[in-house]
């Protein structure tokens, strides 16, 4: 006899993924055994069954490629067959009429619950007399028909998936209802178990393949097969499909119906392929991509798993991508056209066919689901695109604007564009504008796609050029006006959800011209500081010669700005000095000005300090004081604050001498750092000294400028400048004072330094010598390591003494948990373990408990163990130094 399997869904909802997986296994088994696959619609529940659900089930099975050989059969058309079978059971005395009301049954269940018994029917109406039946009918009660199930019955079958399965009659809940209530001698509507058995017998079903949640029904149905005299089929109960928490997948988990997966963009081939793997392992476990026909050739229930199968969305997406990447372009285009149309994209399936296939070729390698094409191809269906922030930043570059302008001059909107033309155009632009190829490519991507990432750039340009969209986007990206033009090829539907991407029928017209592009130098150095940043100007002092120095001060801030102008004073000559310093920062910068004082000769000292910071900025200007000659001093201080304030520095007073001394102090801190550049003092010779100090800080740094002082004698006076900080930073200046001679001993320099430090009320710091002190670092590390190793047992002992109670409690809890866990495993495996093996396991547990108590829990033994460790250490390492 040939194999006959069936799928029997109930039309109370759309085709569920679990029902579809059951259909796949039935179909595969039938094809493997050269049998028949029969479809039966179990619609006996007329209150919940709907025709639209029936249609959804049939359409879903056809969409998956699960064509049935016979059917569909409808149970609602087979009532007469069920009534005859039920009446035969009544005639044989295997079934009876039960007149219990719903209230009586509920009262019975509550009583059983109070006695902590499993709810079941107590068979109270199994042996009613005719007189009792007439009395119930006289009360107007209608009787259901129940099938007798004796408690002492044993039901056993060999399951194709689970092996031998045994049920007791006492576990089936008492006599089961097989027909709904009806008056008199009528037989009511059949219930599930009765209708299923009658249909399977009538259709000669040989194998019943369904989910494991039907195992209890199988025991009841086997009793009905025997009572009706039918041949019992073989049963196979497949594992359930679980959600990520390990529970049965249900409607509460969201996407569960086949129509939902279809809406999400999965192809039927990919979904059917994945459902094969939900509980079944192919002979070659590494071969995960196959058709239903290929799976049917290898299918067997020996490779169906017993454990539930978790639904893995990542695995499904991967399988879907494999199918889409290998699908021919024409077939994939046919599948994507309705998806584009549903998204509101205007296209001509016939006239645009060639262009659409080029688009499919471009996006196919990136597709995971069919619906991904909506977002991926959006930029190709509209004349213009909006630039994101990265693209806008790219197009603010002067080289980008020049590149796009050059492309507009070269490209011909009416001529076809080929790959060779694109490459030649890019080469010409790089030579003409003198920019790197990367700049041109980034500019093209930003203007054409509105983003800095996307599909292949050249292929995208070719597609956009065919629609005439490339010229429009080039012009818009650099701020040129776009004339109102009717778009013939593509227009935006009024109902499209993508209105923000641009109009469909009329090109956007930009009336606001784009800001002129900054020069390359400006784009590299002029960046506004962020919140809480202040730029610090640098003041310079001219020499006593006819020199004109122009400096500009520019401070740009985002939120908090502090601008302090610098007062400059010319020397005794006709000198004009304009001071302005530009400080430009990216995130947070602090520029520390250094004031320089010229000597009485042709000496020029230039000191520049560049400081880059990450977060905060403080600007501290420095004022300089000229010598005792014709001096004009103009000082103006303007302070603009938004959030924070900065204290103005202190200027020092020079005397009229030919010697200049510059004092600067550098203090470095771990978190809050204050960096002060160090100024050197030139002698009265023709010397030019250039000093630059660069300080990089991590969180918040403040650079404190130091004013220089000229003396009238060979004595130099050092003055420290104190700057108030924004957060918590202090600058401690330390000056070094050289004498007017060329030779000076180290002791004299140190003495001078100490004296200067005392005058400044600061700690002396030796900034003169660069001597290196050699330290035997390896020996120190070795000694430190040995000390740590020798003290480790003491540390452990102290830790144990401190937390002795907690550690003991934790140890006992862990021991109890491990013991009970182990004992549970042993008890569970008692059937398969010989008694001798159990004894050895118990001995092992007892020894483990004794060992822990003997060596780890008792204080005396623990101290003994520590003493032994100490002795071993002394023998190996000797006494610690």
UniProtKB/Swiss-Prot annotation:
PANTHER family named in the record: GLUTAMATE--TRNA LIGASE, GLUTAMATE--TRNA LIGASE, MITOCHONDRIAL-RELATED
Membrane topology: Multi-pass membrane protein
Binding positions for ATP per the UniProt entry: 251
Chain positions covered by the region annotation Disordered: 488-747
Swiss-Prot/TrEMBL keywords: Aminoacyl-tRNA synthetase, ATP-binding, Cell membrane, Cytoplasm, Ligase, Membrane, Nucleotide-binding, Protein biosynthesis, Transmembrane, Transmembrane helix
Protein EC: 6.1.1.17
HAMAP family linked to this entry: Glu_tRNA_synth_type1
Annotated region described as Glutamyl-tRNA synthetase, given as residue ranges: 1-480
Keyword Cytoplasm set for record: yes
Protein name according to UniProt: Glutamate--tRNA ligase
Keyword Kinase in annotation: no
Source organism: Trichodesmium erythraeum (strain IMS101)
InterPro entries (alphabetical): aa-tRNA-synth_I_cd-bd, aa-tRNA-synth_I_codon-bd_sub2, aa-tRNA-synth_I_CS, aa_tRNA-synth_I_cd-bd_sf, CAAD_dom, Glu-tRNA-ligase_bac/mito, Glu-tRNA-synth_I_codon-bd_sub1, Glu/Gln-tRNA-synth
Database matches in Pfam families: Anticodon_2, CAAD, tRNA-synt_1c
Motif 'KMSKS' region mapped to chain: 248-252
Motif ('HIGH' region): 9-19
TM regions (residue ranges): 809-829, 832-852
Main location: cytoplasm
Ranges of biased composition (kind: Low complexity): 522-548, 563-576, 591-604, 619-632, 647-660, 675-688, 703-720, 731-742
Biased composition (Basic and acidic residues): 488-502
């Amino acid at each position: 006899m040939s194999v006959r399997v069936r799928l029997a869904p109930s039309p109370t909802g759309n085709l569920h993924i679990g029902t579809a997986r059951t259909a796949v296994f039935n179909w595969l088994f039938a094809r493997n055994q050269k049998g028949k696959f029969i479809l039966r619609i179990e619609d006996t529940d007329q209150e919940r069954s709907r025709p639209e659900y029936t249609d959804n089930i049939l359409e879903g099975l056809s969409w998956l490629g699960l064509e049935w050989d016979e059917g569909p059969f409808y149970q609602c058309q087979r009532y007469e067959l069920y009534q005859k079978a039920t009446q035969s059971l009544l005639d044989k005395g295997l079934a009876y009429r039960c007149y219990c009301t719903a209230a009586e049954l509920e009262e019975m269940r509550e009583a059983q619950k109070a006695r902590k018994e499993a709810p079941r029917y107590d068979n109270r109406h199994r042996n009613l007399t005719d007189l009792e039946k007439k009395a119930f009918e006289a009360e107007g009660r209608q009787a259901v028909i129940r099938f007798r199930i004796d408690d002492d019955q044993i039901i056993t079958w060999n399951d194709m998936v689970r092996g031998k399965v045994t049920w007791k009659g006492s576990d089936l809940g008492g006599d089961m209802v097989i027909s709904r209530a009806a008056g008199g001698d009528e037989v009511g509507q059949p219930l599930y178990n009765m209708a299923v058995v009658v249909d399977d017998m009538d259709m000669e079903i040989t194998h019943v393949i369904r989910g494991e949640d039907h195992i209890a029904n199988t025991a009841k149905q086997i009793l009905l097969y025997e009572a009706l005299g039918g041949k019992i089929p073989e049963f196979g109960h497949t594992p359930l499909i679980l959600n990520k928490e390990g529970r049965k997948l249900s409607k509460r988990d969201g996407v569960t119906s086949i129509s939902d997966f279809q809406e999400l963009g999965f192809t039927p081939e990919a979904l059917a392929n994945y459902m094969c793997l939900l509980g079944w392992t192919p002979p070659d476990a590494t071969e995960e991509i196959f058709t239903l026909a290929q799976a049917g050739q290898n299918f067997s229930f020996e490779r169906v798993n017993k454990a539930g199968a978790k639904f893995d969305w990542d695995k499904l997406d991967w399988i879907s991508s494999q199918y889409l990447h290998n699908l021919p372009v024409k077939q994939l285009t046919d599948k994507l056209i309705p998806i584009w149309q549903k998204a509101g994209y205007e296209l001509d399936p016939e006239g645009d066919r060639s262009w659409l296939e080029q688009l499919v070729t471009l996006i196919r390698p990136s597709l995971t689901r069919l619906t991904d094409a909506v977002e991926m191809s959006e930029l190709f269906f509209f004349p213009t695109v909006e630039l994101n922030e990265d693209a806008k930043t790219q197009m603010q570059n002067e080289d980008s604007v020049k590149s796009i302008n050059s492309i507009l001059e070269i490209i011909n909107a009416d001529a076809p564009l080929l790959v060779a033309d694109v490459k030649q155009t890019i080469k010409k632009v790089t030579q003409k504008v003198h920019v790197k190829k990367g700049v041109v490519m980034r500019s093209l991507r930003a203007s054409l796609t509105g983003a800095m990432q996307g599909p292949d750039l050249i292929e995208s340009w070719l597609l956009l050029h065919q629609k005439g969209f490339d010229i429009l986007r080039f012009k818009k990206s650099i701020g040129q006006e776009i004339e109102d033009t009717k778009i013939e090829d593509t227009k935006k539907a009024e109902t499209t959800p993508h209105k923000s991407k641009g109009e469909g029928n009329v090109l956007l017209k930009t009336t606001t011209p784009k800001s002129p592009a900054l020069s390359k130098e400006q784009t590299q150095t002029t960046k506004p500081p962020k919140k809480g940043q202040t730029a610090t100007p640098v003041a310079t002092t001219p020499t006593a010669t006819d020199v004109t120095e122009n400096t500009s001060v520019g401070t740009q801030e985002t939120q908090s700005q502090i601008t302090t102008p610098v007062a400059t004073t010319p020397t005794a000559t006709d000198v004009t000095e304009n001071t302005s310093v530009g400080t430009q920062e990216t995130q947070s910068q602090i520029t520390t000005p250094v004031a320089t004082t010229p000597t009485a000769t042709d000496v020029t000292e230039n000191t520049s300090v560049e400081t880059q910071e990450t977060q905060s900025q403080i600007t501290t200007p420095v004022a300089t004081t000229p010598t005792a000659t014709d001096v004009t001093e103009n000082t103006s201080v303007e302070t603009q604050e938004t959030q924070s304030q900065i204290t103005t520095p202190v200027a020092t007073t020079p005397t009229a001498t030919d010697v200049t001394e510059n004092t600067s102090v550098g203090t470095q801190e771990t978190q809050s750092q204050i960096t002060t550049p160090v100024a050197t003092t030139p002698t009265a010779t023709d010397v030019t000294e250039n000093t630059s100090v660069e300080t990089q800080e991590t969180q918040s740094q403040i650079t404190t400028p130091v004013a220089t002082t000229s003396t009238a004698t060979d004595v130099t006076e050092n003055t420290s400048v104190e700057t108030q900080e924004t957060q918590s930073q202090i600058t401690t200046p330390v000056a070094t004072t050289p004498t007017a001679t060329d030779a000076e001993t180290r002791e004299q320099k140190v003495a001078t330094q100490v004296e200067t430090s005392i005058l400044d009320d600061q700690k002396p710091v030796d900034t003169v010598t660069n001597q290196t002190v050699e330290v035997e670092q390896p020996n120190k590390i070795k000694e430190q390591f040995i000390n740590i190793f020798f003290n480790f047992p003491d540390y452990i002992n102290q830790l144990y003494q401190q937390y002795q109670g907690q550690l003991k409690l934790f140890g006992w809890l862990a021991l109890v948990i491990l013991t009970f866990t182990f004992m549970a495993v042993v008890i569970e495996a008692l059937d398969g373990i010989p008694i001798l093996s159990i004894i050895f396991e118990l001995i092992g547990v007892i020894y483990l408990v004794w060992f822990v108590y003997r060596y780890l829990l008792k204080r005396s033994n623990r101290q003994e163990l520590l003493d032994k460790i100490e002795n071993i250490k002394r023998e190996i390492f000797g006494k610690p130094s």
